[in-house]
Amino acid sequence: MAAYLLAVAILFCIQGWPLGTVQGQVMPFMEVYRHSVCQPRETLVSILEEYPGEIAHIFRPSCVTALRCGGCCTDESLECTATGKRSVGREIMRLSPHKGTSEKEVMQFTEHTDCECRPRSASGVNSRKHKRNPEEGEQRAKFPFV
């Protein structure tokens, strides 16, 4: 029994380590840099965020993987932006509680094929660095919309 518990503890410890590294090992600079650049990355995408008109349904899984641009640019005035896109299908299960039905179907999602660091839009820079408050003239919605 003790050997079993030790094996389980070791398994949990190993699963917590980043893939391809050994605990205590330092990832070399070029590998860190290669992983951080602006490029398409596997990202979890919420089905309801992509299809907000489908709130009457439950989806399983509730999110899918898709390649989306992400990573660092060399300057804060730049952002990682998609320069190429394609549509990909993902098979999901749609549950309709009001009808009491469920069915598999293919839903389309946008996937990024190419990414590039491009200048941020003027509104993007302002909204990230400075959030306005009611005293500055911004109208805020009342409760429950905070």
From Swiss-Prot:
* SUPFAM superfamilies cross-referenced by the UniProt entry: Cystine-knot cytokines
Signal peptide positions are 1-24
Residues that the record marks as modified (Pyrrolidone carboxylic acid) are 25
Instruction: Indicate what this protein is called per its UniProt record.
Output: Snake venom vascular endothelial growth factor toxin
An example GO BP is:
vascular endothelial growth factor receptor signaling pathway
Instruction: List the GO terms this entry assigns under cellular component, sorted alphabetically.
Output: extracellular space; membrane
**Which species does the entry assign this protein to?**
Bothrops erythromelas (Caatinga lance head)
Q: Would the keyword Transferase be found if you checked this record's keyword annotation?
A: no
Region annotated Disordered, chain positions: 118-146
**UniProt record similarity statement:** Belongs to the PDGF/VEGF growth factor family. Snake venom VEGF subfamily.
What job does the chain carry out? Answer: Snake venom VEGFs that may contribute to venom dispersion and prey subjugation by inducing vascular permeability and hypotension. This protein induces an increase in capillary permeability after intradermal injection, as well as a drastic hypotensive effect after intravenous injection. The hypotension is mediated by nitric oxide (NO), which is produced by VEGF-activated endothelium NO synthase. Also induces angiogenesis in vitro. Like other crotalid VEGFs, this protein interacts with VEGF receptor-1 (FLT1) with a high affinity, whereas it binds to VEGF receptor-2 (KDR) with a low affinity.
Question: Which pairs of Cys residues are joined through disulfide bonds in the record?
Answer: 38-80, 69-115, 73-117
**Tissue specificity statement from the Swiss-Prot or TrEMBL entry:** Expressed by the venom gland.
Q: What is the lineage of its organism?
A: Eukaryota, Metazoa, Chordata, Craniata, Vertebrata
Q: Which UniProt keywords are listed?
A: Disulfide bond, Growth factor, Pyrrolidone carboxylic acid, Secreted, Signal, Toxin
Q: How does it assemble?
A: Homodimer; disulfide-linked. Interacts with VEGF receptor-1 (FLT1) with a high affinity, whereas it binds to VEGF receptor-2 (KDR) with a low affinity. Does not bind VEGF receptor-3 (FLT4).
Q: Answer yes or no on keyword Secreted.
A: yes
Molecular function GO labels: chemoattractant activity; growth factor activity; toxin activity; vascular endothelial growth factor receptor binding
Bias category Basic and acidic residues: which stretches?
Answer: 133-146
Q: Which Pfam families match?
A: PDGF
Q: Where's it found, cell-wise?
A: Secreted
